[in-house]
Amino acid sequence: MEEQDARVPALEPFRVEQAPPLIYYVPDFISKEEEEYLLRQVFNAPKPKWTQLSGRKLQNWGGLPHPRGMVPERLPPWLQRYVDKVSDLSLFGGLPANHVLVNQYLPGEGIMPHEDGPLYYPTVSTISLGSHTVLDFYEPRQPDDDVPMEQPRPPQRPITSLLVEPRSLLVLRGTAYTRLLHGISATRVDELDATSLPPNATACKSALPGAHLVRGTRVSLTIRRVPRVLRASLLLSK
């Protein structure tokens, strides 16, 4: 078994059963006061730090990941504290996380199914702030020779979905990271099935059968490790 597929001893009580391996969901990883503090810091960041994308906007901290290596930038103390807290769980092969992507999603915004790619150590950890969301997991699309290219394909259905509440920590490793795609639908209300709740429902206070969960503004701190790091002088010389 490869190292990235190994279970995390510190998080075993929070492993999500009945879900692709390996997914850990930790409710109330931070306190309400910490959540409020982090939201203040995020929204007090200088305007040039924000990048507007279709369906969300983001801040990049720690450097810009690059195939030739990332030129590291010092994380601000308000972020470093939580990067250290996540790194202490030994998620990144015994090395510390060094990169944080801050995403803001307004109600009705989401992100298409995607994979995080080879620039990162194959583990992703996310602290959620402000609002819940539902994270959907998908099998990668396979070429279908029977469907003409010009014919639209039916919408892909997720193989499973997790309810992600504010102040939680979500960790994806193994198959959940390396093979599956994950995304967030662009909706304002998440309706929970009355007969089939998300596999992490027992850890979510709002996961009630038939619940209609109205999304607010959500901020996520996606904490990862970029293995390949360069000094600025080396990058500029290439």
Curated annotation (Swiss-Prot):
Keyword Oxidoreductase: yes
Alphabetized GO MF terms: dioxygenase activity; metal ion binding
UniProt keyword annotation of Cytoplasm present: yes
Binding site for Fe cation: 114, 116, 182
Role this protein plays: Probable Fe(2+)/2-oxoglutarate-dependent dioxygenase involved in oxidative demethylation of nucleic acids. Binds nucleic acids with a preference for ssDNA or ssRNA to other types of DNAs. May play a role in nucleic acid damage repair.
Subunit structure: Interacts with VCPKMT.
Keywords, ordered alphabetically: Cytoplasm, Dioxygenase, Iron, Metal-binding, Nucleus, Oxidoreductase
Cellular component aspect of the GO annotation: cytoplasm; focal adhesion; nucleoplasm
Taxonomic placement: Eukaryota, Metazoa, Chordata, Craniata, Vertebrata
Enzyme Commission designation: 1.14.11.-
Pfam families: 2OG-FeII_Oxy_2
Domain of life: Eukaryota
Subcellular localization, as worded in the UniProt entry: Cytoplasm; Nucleus
Record's protein name: Probable RNA/DNA demethylase ALKBH6
Enzyme class, UniProt record, top EC level: oxidoreductase
